Amino acid sequence: TKKYGYGVPLLGRDWYIGDNIGTDVILTSPANPGEAHDYDENKYAVLHEIVHAYVSVMNPDIDLWLTEGVALYLSNGEPFYKEYLEYVAIPAYKDTTSNNPLTFSNCGGYTFSHTYIEYLDHTYGWDRVLKLISTKNYEECFNKSKKEIYEEWVHYIDNYYQ
């Protein structure tokens, strides 16, 4: 894609199904989805990528952790089970601040980021989530630093899920 270059297929990332560049949504063809996806998964990816496009309208400089978290939370995030913690570690704070898509994927971003948005929504309300998307200003939205919110979320993951 334009965002990552033509090297993406060479990385062997067969999970790659779609993307957005601003408000333009790019998807793998449902008629030829490749080996990792089927027609129905392409249909679900449409909503996910449209959420990204809408978030991009709200804030074109949004952090990857937030935009993926919102897109997964509102569209197709898999349910989270505490047993996952036996196999995958909660992403480190520095990983949640990276805008590198490979870092995001490798640290478990697709497993965890929607739980971050879920935590913010349940704890502070959807209006605060929307404000955070627009401003990226944790202090203004929550009267707490980004790191403090991260630590609260880790506590939520460790204690909320059964």
Which residues does each predicted region cover?
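Auxiliary, metal-adjacent structural segments of Zn-dependent hydrolase domains
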Residues: 1-21
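Zn2+-dependent metallopeptidase catalytic core
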Residues: 1-8, 43, 47, 153
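Acidic/His/Gly-enriched intrinsically disordered linker/tail segments
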Residues: 16-20, 38-41, 45, 57-162
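Short carbohydrate-recognition loop motifs
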Residues: 24-27
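Active-site-proximal loop and beta-strand segments within enzyme catalytic domains
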Residues: 33-35
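Short active-site segment of divalent metal-dependent hydrolases/proteases
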Residues: 51, 55
